[in-house]
Amino acid sequence: MASQGTKRSYEQMETDGERQNATEIRASVGKMIGGIGRFYIQMCTELKLNDYEGRLIQNSLTIERMVLSAFDERRNKYLEEHPSAGKDPKKTGGPIYKRVDGKWVRELVLYDKEEIRRIWRQANNGDDATAGLTHIMIWHSNLNDTTYQRTRALVRTGMDPRMCSLMQGSTLPRRSGAAGAAVKGVGTMVLELIRMIKRGINDRNFWRGENGRKTRIAYERMCNILKGKFQTAAQRAMMDQVRESRNPGNAEIEDLTFLARSALILRGSVAHKSCLPACVYGPAVASGYDFEKEGYSLVGIDPFKLLQTSQVYSLIRPNENPAHKSQLVWMACNSAAFEDLRVSSFIRGTRVLPRGKLSTRGVQIASNENMDSIVSSTLELRSRYWAIRTRSGGNTNQQRASAGQISIQPTFSVQRNLPFDKTTIMAAFTGNAEGRTSDMRAEIIKMMESARPEEVSFQGRGVFELSDERATNPIVPSFDMSNEGSYFFGDNAEEYDN
């Protein structure tokens, strides 16, 4: 992307940093990871978890959610002002799982939010360490992206379920900051904007008064974030139109839906970060590893190296397949929910299956599920190779607008050719070409039509041996291109419902 120079790197977003050099960035990301690890160790002590229980991913998720809840100021304020029966706004908690007499039992714990905040700040040298909180949010978001398909949310806003590969980060909270905005897919941003416009249509005071002014600023900011994800002039020009509209309405919704469809071929740039559960960082810190001193990157070899040596366990329901559960978590850890399965399989070194073929439900266990027949097993999170995470969208040629793969949003910077059946996508673009954006629409359609499927994305980029830390010898895989490897396509994954 030509404008790369004006953008902050993920690590700067992740650490709210000013311009830093690579070493400073690695150190500040390392500091953030170390803080999460120290917090996790302290929480395991508080909860009297043994080593095995502390490495249980379900316990990790509960502890992570407690700290996110403790720092959710808006919700905390709302809860104080709207007390609901049986809910203490000052407390947070969740299920903690322990081994008792050879069986797993669920124990519901409750803590003062103030106490959790104190432990978190103490682990982070007295800071609020918002970057660490965002990091945890992105891990939860990546896990949701891997576990659930957002078809229903898409259909509700008048979009097509085929656009699920644009939905990265759709469950991220609004307060996730610049680092969160970077990992949101084009579809996620479009969905947020359409929801906003619909509210404005139904509630005439939405854009008015002091609150309306704030709403308007938020609307324009979201438009700019989305504009920044597009890589062609025509798509960006259309976003300017949407942003500058005096009174956003159905015309804007149509423009946004058109843009989302166009992003299936003219891919947006969406960041990918490997955010791991706290129960990976904790034991690493406990073993004496100094993340800040050693430095850490979310987009290089570091997460792969960390997962190679980590032991993480998971509870398994009676009819679930532990290998499938492992794949789910592996994909979440590598932010690979929308990557081509052939690329993921090559990197992982074992075949990665589409969601509908997995015999596993989500990682979290509902409070009404019976614990009697629940067992635990080791998650296999290691990989055969490592690869650099990308944010380019995989368009083949940046000078001339060109195609990225259709049903996926690439995670890894690894060469692949583009099998796609353009006709099905192009069929969606017949119809409305008049109105104020007609020339831009025509240009976008022309670019999409000229995109050639025989092109190659990430030319010359390969994967690396885990011993090749400096990424000196790229191994360029060759893929059988008879089928395109989308994780969700032709599939029936459960829906995510908030």
From Swiss-Prot:
Biological process according to GO: symbiont entry into host cell; viral penetration into host nucleus
Keyword Nucleotide-binding set for record: no
Family matches, as SUPFAM superfamilies: flu NP-like (SSF161003)
Region (Disordered): 1-21
Location(s) in or outside the cell: Virion; Host nucleus
Residues spanned by motif Unconventional nuclear localization signal: 1-18
Listed Basic and acidic residues bias regions: 8-21
InterPro entries linked to this entry: Flu_NP (IPR002141)
Keywords associated with the record: Capsid protein, Helical capsid protein, Host nucleus, Host-virus interaction, Ribonucleoprotein, RNA-binding, Viral nucleoprotein, Viral penetration into host nucleus, Virion, Virus entry into host cell
Short motif Bipartite nuclear localization signal, span: 198-216
Post-translational modification: Late in virus-infected cells, may be cleaved from a 56-kDa protein to a 53-kDa protein by a cellular caspase. This cleavage might be a marker for the onset of apoptosis in infected cells or have a specific function in virus host interaction.
GO CC annotation: helical viral capsid; host cell; host cell nucleus; ribonucleoprotein complex; viral nucleocapsid
Biological role: Encapsidates the negative strand viral RNA, protecting it from nucleases. The encapsidated genomic RNA is termed the ribonucleoprotein (RNP) and serves as template for transcription and replication. The RNP needs to be localized in the host nucleus to start an infectious cycle, but is too large to diffuse through the nuclear pore complex. NP comprises at least 2 nuclear localization signals that are responsible for the active RNP import into the nucleus through cellular importin alpha/beta pathway.
Family to which the UniProt record says this protein belongs: Belongs to the influenza viruses nucleoprotein family.
Assembly and oligomerization: Homomultimerizes to form the nucleocapsid. May bind host exportin-1/XPO1. Binds to viral genomic RNA. Protein-RNA contacts are mediated by a combination of electrostatic interactions between positively charged residues and the phosphate backbone and planar interactions between aromatic side chains and bases.
Protein's recorded name: Nucleoprotein
Organism: Influenza A virus (strain A/USA:Memphis/10/1996 H1N1)
Gene expressing this chain: NP
